[in-house]
């Protein structure tokens, strides 16, 4: 897959995003 970040070991963020408390957020 094209996931680069995993939130809490479960939730997968796309490459341009990062994991934050509220979920995946766009990585500037």
From Swiss-Prot:
Tissue: Expressed by the venom duct.
Keyword Secreted: yes
Chief location category: secreted
Subcellular localization, as worded in the UniProt entry: Secreted
UniProt keyword annotation of Secreted present: yes
GO molecular function annotations of the record: toxin activity
Disulphide bridges: 3-13, 7-19, 12-24
GO CC aspect terms: extracellular region
Key words, A-Z: Disulfide bond, Knottin, Neurotoxin, Secreted, Toxin
Top-level lineage group: Eukaryota
Domains: entry comment: The presence of a 'disulfide through disulfide knot' structurally defines this protein as a knottin. The cysteine framework is VI/VII (C-C-CC-C-C).
Protein name: Conotoxin Cl6a
Organism of provenance: Californiconus californicus
């Amino acid at each position: 897959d094209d996931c680069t970040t995993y939130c809490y070991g479960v939730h997968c963020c796309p490459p341009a995003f990062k994991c934050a408390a509220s979920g995946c957020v766009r990585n500037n």
